[in-house]
UniProtKB/Swiss-Prot annotation:
Entry EC number(s): 2.7.7.38
Enzyme class name: transferase
Name under which the protein is recorded: 3-deoxy-manno-octulosonate cytidylyltransferase
A GO cellular component entry from the record: cytosol
Functional pathway: Nucleotide-sugar biosynthesis; CMP-3-deoxy-D-manno-octulosonate biosynthesis; CMP-3-deoxy-D-manno-octulosonate from 3-deoxy-D-manno-octulosonate and CTP: step 1/1; Bacterial outer membrane biogenesis; lipopolysaccharide biosynthesis
Gene3D superfamilies named in the record: Spore Coat Polysaccharide Biosynthesis Protein SpsA, Chain A (3.90.550.10)
Species the sequence originates in: Alkalilimnicola ehrlichii (strain ATCC BAA-1101 / DSM 17681 / MLHE-1)
């Protein structure tokens, strides 16, 4: 039997690097519309946009999207999801996927994959995905979050540093570092059980969370198991700054305009 799941798309207006980002035009449509189309391709039972801004809400409602207005002071997208889950009265065992509002190239099949991965691992509170790194520059980049898993695929740690550290390769003692395929790059796509989302806002922040600026470390620090699956495909890039729009628009044009 197919596991039903809900996709919630947090869409914040006041991005530091790109204010109003969800409304940025891509192929004549607001970016948030493209993200909603990716969610629809996943086969989700329900799709909601969670936003703190009336213009974003208006743009979504014009296209018939379900919108939940949230507080503007949430420190993270996970906190925003927690508010939505609480307000909608979702059951603790329901699965919610957090699809970021700046990921118009995230394939719907990956959204579905992460939801089904969580459903298959009952002892996990969270599921997420990773891909193999493709270059040593990617391994070393602090913008590419790396993850180390145990033998069953559960996360041991996430870091902006190149983990695991190649002692010989990176020190130069044994020549060039190993193939970049030895490292896993984390994708910022999560599935949560609603029971965990309800607990999250009350959890004490973890010391490494602030150092790394990675909110998933809070869950690990509190003993929540995070299952990390290998993504069935490599997604296109997200939109962090206005400079990213041209590349993303070109890639979207190759896929065809949204319906």
């Amino acid at each position: 039997m197919t596991t039903p799941f809900t996709v919630i798309i947090p869409a914040r207006y006041a991005s530091h690097r790109f204010p109003g980002k969800p409304l940025a035009s891509l192929l004549g449509w607001p970016m948030i519309h493209h993200v909603c189309r990716r969610a629809e391709e996943s086969g989700a039972a329900r799709i909601l946009v969670a936003t703190d801004h009336r213009e974003i809400a208006h743009a979504c409602r014009e296209e018939g999207r379900e919108v939940v207005m949230t507080r503007h002071d949430h420190p993270s997208g996970t906190d925003r999801l927690a508010e939505v889950a609480e307000r909608l009265g979702l059951d603790d065992d329901q699965i919610v996927v957090n699809l970021q509002g700046d990921e118009p190239l995230m394939p719907g099949r990956l959204v579905r994959q992460v939801a089904l991965d969580l459903a298959a691992h009952r002892d996990a509170g969270i599921a997420t995905l990773a891909t193999l790194c493709h270059s040593l520059d990617e391994v070393r980049s602090p913008h590419a979050v790396k993850v180390v898993r145990d033998r069953q695929g559960y996360a041991l740690y996430f870091s902006r540093a190149p983990i695991p550290w190649d002692r010989d390769g990176f020190s130069g003692a044994a020549g060039a570092a190993r193939s970049p395929g030895q490292w896993l790059r984390h994708l910022g796509l999560y599935a949560y059980r609603v029971g965990f989302l309800r607990r999250y806002p009350a959890l004490e922040a973890a010391p490494p969370e602030g150092l790394e600026a990675l909110e998933q470390l809070r869950a690990l620090w509190h003993g929540v198991r995070i299952h990390v699956g290998l993504a069935h495909q490599v997604p296109g890039p997200g939109v962090d700054t206005p400079q990213d729009l041209a590349q993303v628009e070109r890639l979207l044009a190759e896929q065809g305009p949204p319906a």
